[in-house]
Structures are given as structure tokens and as C-alpha cells.
Amino acid sequence: MCVQFVSSYGLILRMSVAISTSHRRFSTVAIIGKHGEFGASSSALGELADFLDRRGHQVVFESATAKDLGRSNLIAMTLEQIGRDADVAIVIGGDGTMLGIARQLAPFDVPLIGVNQGRLGFMTDITFERMLPVLSDMLDGKLESERRTLLEGVVHRQGKEIFRSVAFNDVVVSRGAGAGMVELRVEVDAHFMYNQRSDGLIISTPTGSTAYALAAGGPILHPELGGIVLVPIAPHALSNRPIVLSDSCEIVVELASGRDCSVNFDMQSLTSLYHHDRVTVRRSEHSIQFLHPEGWSYYDTLREKLHWNEYPSVLGQLK
């Protein structure tokens, strides 16, 4: 942290001070692992648990992670219990794992640390190989903190609510695999914006702007920007371009025509849509706190994950 005081000469002096908060701030640490064949190995999870225990933290495991580990002396908790009792949660997996965990823990405001065992690792930015030394520094208070927004969406059919969910990346209204284009009527804050014929519409948070929205031609939004981006998917009219809105807006998408349509939230929960169903999307009241290693930068993440400043060689390899 930075301590600021005024000297006898009226000069403002600043000192950078690293304060150990391992026992005060992070007393109870939860470990949540990716399950199944490609999850973290039992030996790696056990090594992490032993490391945290030696540091004096109380270690708890998400229930399925504890079952995968196979030890008898573990404290196992549901995600709801972790949300109530843990001071921080370490999530080991890929971005998909982090998406699901973040959505469920957002109402509890538990800080999340991501250890990457997936492919890209936009949100799980600690490499598996350097997990222990990096976590040691972070749990001593040498870290960066940031907050990310979520979206909440409600589907109404004939005036009645039929489905509700939240999204960390995006809410996507899309056509069925065997159907033609859909026609969507879009309103923003009760103002008609347009009718759009396309394969669908992506409504994205700044976090999701580097995911499906980016692949569909949308802009990258900095996570600290209070915005929501609408990105058409393969629009019939080339004039239907992405647009960035304030995250204070309420967006309503009505299915004017189309077959086998659906709306999904982070590709993890979905429901079918019928003619004249209305999807209302707004910023959620909850947010997610991510903790990163000291010196972390969003621009470093973009440069590394999107391979900026790298150019193909004559052999086709990036340099």
C-alpha cells in the first residue's frame, strides 16, 4: 500500500509499504478445482493445501474438489458455504471454470484468485507452475485488486417471467442450428433502436468483450469502463454495427420472428424463445472482485493472450 504524509516543510511524501495481511485478511482460504479428467491433479491440490496450512490459513475445499482429492481430513463446503465463510477463493482451472464459479459466488463478494490450467487464461492469470511462490506473495498482501460487472437478464412471455439468470461475459440471443435468420426488435431505456435481421445479438460486459463479442467483430472494452456492448451476429444489413452503451441502460430484445431461437447466459444456462418473448438485460447489482499478482496489468494480459507485438516468421511461427 502507499502511505502519504505531510512533512514539516509542507511537502507531501509517499512511501510504498508492503503489509502482511495473510492472517488478518485471508484467514480462511477456499480451494476450488476443475473437475474431471482434465482437472488439477490430486498431488497438486494436496501440495497447495499443505502449503496454505503451513502458512497458518484455515483451508477449506469445495465439495466436489474435496471428493476428487480423496483425503479424509478435509473441510468440505458447498459454494454457498464458501461464499459465507471464506475470505478468499483460489480457483484452479480455465476461464470456463472461473466463469461458473464467479457467477455463483458474486452475491457473496468473495475475492477470487485464478490459477490457469486451461487454454487461454484471461481470468486465470497465474501459471500452474508458479502457483506457490506467486500465491505466497499475494496472501502477504502484494497484489492488485479489480472489480468486474455482471449482467442480469429476465425473459418474459405474455407478460409473465419465465426465466432469470446472470452473465459474467455475455447474454446471447441466437437462432437455432437449422433455422434461418431471426428478426429482433431492440429497445434501450424504452426507446426503440432498430429491428435487426441476423443470426443473433450479443449483449456483452467489458469482460466479455474479449470473448464471443470480439470474435463477432465487437470492440474491446476496458474492465473499468462502465459500458455494455451490443454486437450483431452476421447481420443482414452491413450498417448494423456494434454499439457501446452506458451500463446504466436497460436493454430489451424482443423476438419478432424466427424459429428454434434461444437466449443463453455465458453459454452455461439457457432457455428457448418463442415469438414476442422479451429478454430484458441490465447491469447486475452484484460485482466480482479479482485479485492479481503485484504489477499485473490488463494491457499485459491483452498483449500476451492476443499475441500483440508478435509477427509471423517465414516459417509461419509467431515471433
Regions found by a protein language model. Give the residues of each.
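Catalytic core of DAGKc-family lipid kinases
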Residues: 119-199
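Short glycine/serine/threonine-rich phosphate/pyrophosphate-binding segments
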Residues: 40-41, 96-102, 209-215
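ATP/NTP phosphate-donor binding region
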Residues: 14-88, 92, 100, 129-146, ...
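Short, Lys/Arg-enriched N-terminal segments with co-localized hydrophobic residues
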Residues: 5-14, 275
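Gly/Ser/Thr-rich active-site loops/lids in small-molecule metabolic enzymes
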Residues: 191-239
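ATP/nucleoside-binding phosphotransfer catalytic cores, i.e., glycine-rich phosphate-binding loops
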Residues: 173, 189-192, 239-319
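Gly/Ser-rich helix-loop-strand patches that form or flank binding pockets
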Residues: 105-115, 122
